[in-house]
Amino acid sequence: MVSKSLFLAAAVNLAGVLAQAPRPSLNGNEVISGVLEGKVDTFKGIPFADPPLNDLRFKHPQPFTGSYQGLKANDFSPACMQLDPGNSLTLLDKALGLAKVIPEEFRGPLYDMAKGTVSMNEDCLYLNVFRPAGTKPDAKLPVMVWIYGGAFVYGSSAAYPGNSYVKESINMGQPVVFVSINYRTGPFGFLGGDAITAEGNTNAGLHDQRKGLEWVSDNIANFGGDPDKVMIFGESAGAMSVAHQLIAYGGDNTYNGKKLFHSAILQSGGPLPYHDSSSVGPDISYNRFAQYAGCDTSASANDTLECLRSKSSSVLHDAQNSYDLKDLFGLLPQFLGFGPRPDGNIIPDAAYELFRSGRYAKVPYISGNQEDEGTAFAPVALNATTTPHVKKWLQYIFYDASEASIDRVLSLYPQTLSVGSPFRTGILNALTPQFKRVAAILSDMLFQSPRRVMLSATKDVNRWTYLSTHLHNLVPFLGTFHGNELIFQFNVNIGPANSYLRYFISFANHHDPNVGTNLLQWDQYTDEGKEMLEIHMTDNVMRTDDYRIEGISNFETDVNLYG
């Protein structure tokens, strides 16, 4: 039998916890409650749009029309419907034996981030707020808004809790509010083809992000954040999303007469040189999705779209997971099956052209890459073991390219093992005779060239760039691989964690990564000096952004190789 004194002690303790639970108000008098997690107040699963269900499936998000009163913002919401990320991990496992090549302390966090920790549901347009415990509404703290990656086919804000950023910002004396936003991916968020284009509902996932930013503008002051000091940042598809938010509506990032964001960080991603939303690539993706869902693709485009809207979530989830991974990561034109595309609306023109013509939001930014971005993707081309195989693969990706353009790529990226990726490893790490070559091509095509396009086109804003090499010679076959930096930002506080957290927190506060970090001075990028920070495991150095000039420039300038 539980004693009366123990019961009273437990009751007093519970009352203390409840008394500490943060309780901000929204819409004037609608009170929500969060959870105190050590030094951090957390508010998880706050709706920012109406559920995109039934007739709203595949459509742009609508403003939230419900009430927040009494919302217990204790738990993350479900993730949006998506590809099972375990499939891609299985592919990498088969190709590389991840358990053997990735250090144990990294493997668990990497798998957790990829697989996610929450269920899936079409009712998924929620966001999360993390702030220093006890922050008052008038604190006006800088706001860091995180947009997750996942190749535009998977991802969830639940995989990226903001506690580490908020705690480090407190330690630095530069406190921030951290916000993470869910958005629809795959066909639910980036369905292309004639029908969805004609309907005017392309790039729904980008609109989800925008709607989340509008919510931040309207409401973050209630949590102690400053709507006039918002930084957007993300990794991989999240960074690509940031790039497309910069060029959205031709660079108009205003809402109700005020800027939605004031600075940006792009980690391993930039503008995508895609064809428009009704071109061959999205049309193939649309038709395959419809076929896998049991819809008649020989019917009218509108009838097929209505068929897709009539299907259950589980049927569409199965359809999305019916794609061969090679369809999504390598054998659909222009590499990615889903993602932001020019539509004459939110993306009014080709992404590169928007940057080069000055039609982008004029805010300071940081953009950087991991040294070996392509190694995690190269297994999709494991069967390409000869130069003719690689040529055929490139011809399918760049379906508009001339044979001369393809041959030039092959000449700039030869089979020579010592120049492939993982870079600077000589003849080692050659999983197949063409693996390092394909990895180098993918690294520069998808990640390095978009970064340099942005840097060269944005001379009228302050910008910084970096290259991370901290896993060099530590992870066989992968090197400093795509996505590894997330482990250091959200899971493991070792090695380069301080560099990412401190530089980025300083940037959110001051639009300068160098204030109060106790780290190496990071010089701004200039066209003349091409200054670049190189992030190591325990220290950093300044270097010049001058590697693989000819190969990367070719991807920037050959119009046959981009949209």
From Swiss-Prot:
Protein biosynthesis found in the keyword field: no
Glycosylated residue positions: 302, 383
GO BP annotations listed: lipid catabolic process
Keyword Oxidoreductase: no
EC code(s) of this entry: 3.1.1.3
Reactions listed under catalytic activity: a triacylglycerol + H2O = a diacylglycerol + a fatty acid + H(+)
Cellular compartment(s): Secreted
Family note: Belongs to the type-B carboxylesterase/lipase family.
Self-association state and partner proteins as the record states: Monomer.
Name listed for the protein in its UniProt record: Lipase 2
Gene: LIP2
